[in-house]
UniProtKB/Swiss-Prot annotation:
Localization in the cell: Plastid, Chloroplast
InterPro entries, per database record: Domain_X, Maturase_MatK, Maturase_MatK_N
Alphabetical keyword list: Chloroplast, mRNA processing, Plastid, RNA-binding, tRNA processing
rRNA-binding among keywords: no
HAMAP family assigned to the protein according to its UniProt record, in alphabetical order: MatK (MF_01390)
Record GO biological process: mRNA processing; RNA splicing; tRNA processing
Ranges in coiled-coil conformation: none
Keyword Secreted set for record: no
Major location category of this protein: plastid
Family statement: Belongs to the intron maturase 2 family. MatK subfamily.
Listed name of the protein: Maturase K
GO cellular component, one term: chloroplast
Species, as recorded: Cyrilla racemiflora
GO molecular function, one term: RNA binding
């Protein structure tokens, strides 16, 4: 980061961010390359090294510098979709590499501005509390006394020019913004980068980082105004408190919410939430929840307020049917790969008064999280691990790998899913997922060696079982290797709800929405 400050020439006011020279630095593309290698949870990054090799990056930078000084640098070839006079051959590949590098470049001034704004302020930073699992203890603690929730799907049909214009207010480097606008319009398949979905906003995996940044930055702009308006109408505005959580830093508690509002403008957030005694808002990517304690009429006003606010002030076309009003008493929230609901836990208390005893019934609201097994099987079916009914299938594409690599891949996928769904109280459905992946692994091995599934399960039974052990099971067997009843111990483990603090993105298979 110190190396980049020399190019940015940032002053203390952080008003003039000159990021254009960074586009021609090879180290930027190395950072983007390392980020891409660590992105996938399903080990689908084969061939990434070939696409982003140092030789290609050097050739691209040299070509860019040469073409920048030519008069006809913005002339396109209408006859060849894979070539133009600016990028030459491999237009799509070069555009992809540049956009990945630009995603790193455009985040630097925001991160530097955030770091400089933290100097001298008593804000605790913790890398262990950046997990998106942190949102569920927040809901468990605050949502039990609320009545209704707005299930909001944020509009996804945004023109990329609007995203660039929003970024223009914070990045004063016109050259970089013109170059970004040029590549967005030059890229032949840019319409496919933003994929409309029936239930959520999604991106293609190519150039995902840049478009997520631009989209989330645009969303945070309207969220900051929404927070301001909410504070103006809050009855406890002077003592309202807030929690600001994003993918890098965690701030425990801030007395004045306007302070949080500044940070949401200064740095891009992926996960963001705030609270007051009557209103709670949570967002992750393209879906948000607004829970409140009030009548359905109030929630209906909030619903149409969001629609008009998006359309009139932020050019985001929306429809009322994308916002659903649901009572928390009998509705499950489908959020971040979990089904969350409020369950009544009845209890009886005997009260003794002199010679008379009275039985008092009491029902306590309890926050319950479960694994949605049907959508999860649907995700496995799309990934060709099973059919739509959940019957395991082989993976012919992996048959060329070694046996150990095949077993490791299947085991890694299950451990990631089990790790992500560790917060569920009822993990019985995970046994079904383990069964599907184990049998799919055995079918793949049998297909490779032209043998039967029964033979491989008999020969690799113990080894195959160990590969599908979760962390909790491994700890149990290491701690109690000679336990008289291991199944009883595992039952106690599976009845516990665990939230991990190292999960910074939703699992690809769990993101079934």
């Amino acid at each position: 980061m110190e190396e980049f400050k020399r190019y940015l020439e940032l002053d203390r006011s952080q008003q003039h961010d000159f990021i254009y020279p960074l586009i021609f630095q090879e180290s930027i593309y190395a950072l983007a390359h390392d980020h891409g290698l660590n992105r996938s949870l399903l080990l689908e990054n084969e061939g990434y090294d070939n696409k982003s090799s140092l030789l290609i990056v050097k050739r691209l930078i040299t070509h860019l510098i040469t073409q920048m000084y030519q008069q006809n640098r913005f002339i396109f070839s209408a006859n060849d979709s894979n070539q133009n006079h600016f990028l030459g051959h491999n237009t799509n590949l070069y555009s992809q590499i540049i956009l990945e590098g630009f995603a790193v470049v455009v985040e630097i001034p925001f991160s530097l501005r955030l770091i400089s704004s933290l100097e001298g302020k008593e804000i605790v930073k913790s890398h262990n509390l950046r997990s998106i699992h942190s949102i569920f203890p927040f809901l468990e603690d605050k949502i039990s006394h609320l009545n209704y929730v707005l299930d909001i799907l944020i509009p996804h049909s945004i023109h990329l020019e609007i995203l660039v214009q929003t970024l223009r207010y914070w990045v004063k480097d016109a050259s970089s913004l013109h170059l970004l606008r040029f590549f967005l319009h030059e890229y032949r398949n840019w319409n496919s980068l933003i994929t409309p979905n029936k239930s959520s906003f999604s991106f293609s995996k190519r150039n995902q980082r840049l478009f997520l940044f631009l989209y989330n930055f645009h969303v945070c702009e309207y969220e900051s105004i929404f927070v301001f308006l909410r504070n103006q109408s809050s009855h406890l505005r002077s003592i309202s408190s807030g929690t600001f959580l994003e993918r890098i830093y965690f701030y425990r508690k801030i007395e004045h919410f306007v302070f949080v509002e500044v940070f949401t403008k200064d740095f891009q957030t992926v996960l963001w939430l705030f609270k007051d005694p009557f209103l709670h808002y949570v967002r992750y990517q393209g879906k948000s929840l607004l829970a409140a304690k009030g009548a359905s009429l109030l929630m209906n006003k909030w619903k149409y307020y969001f629609v008009n606010f998006w359309q009139c002030y932020f050019s985001m076309w929306s429809q009322p049917r994308r916002i659903h009003i649901n009572p928390l008493s009998n509705h499950s929230l489908d959020f971040l790969g979990y089904l969350s609901s409020m369950r009544l836990n009845p209890s009886m208390v005997r009260s003794q008064m002199l010679e008379n005893s009275v039985l008092l019934g009491n029902a306590i609201k309890k926050f319950d999280t479960t694994v949605p097994i049907t959508p999860l099987i649907g995700s496995l079916s799309k990934a060709k691990f099973c059919n739509v009914l959940g019957h395991p299938l082989s993976k012919p594409a992996w048959a060329d790998l070694s046996d150990s690599d095949i077993i490791d891949r299947f085991g890694c996928i299950y451990r990631n899913l089990s790790h992500y769904h560790s917060g569920s109280l009822k993990k019985k459905s995970l046994y079904q997922i383990k069964y599907i992946l184990r049998l799919s692994c055995a079918r793949t091995l049998a297909r490779k060696h032209k043998s039967t599934v029964r033979a491989f399960l008999k020969r690799l039974g113990v080894e195959l079982l160990e590969e599908f052990f979760t962390e909790e099971e491994q700890v149990f067997y290491l701690t109690f290797p000679k336990a008289s009843s291991p199944s009883r111990g595992l039952y106690r483990i599976y009845r516990k709800r665990v939230w991990y603090l190292d999960i910074i993105c939703i699992n690809d298979l769990a993101n079934h929405s």
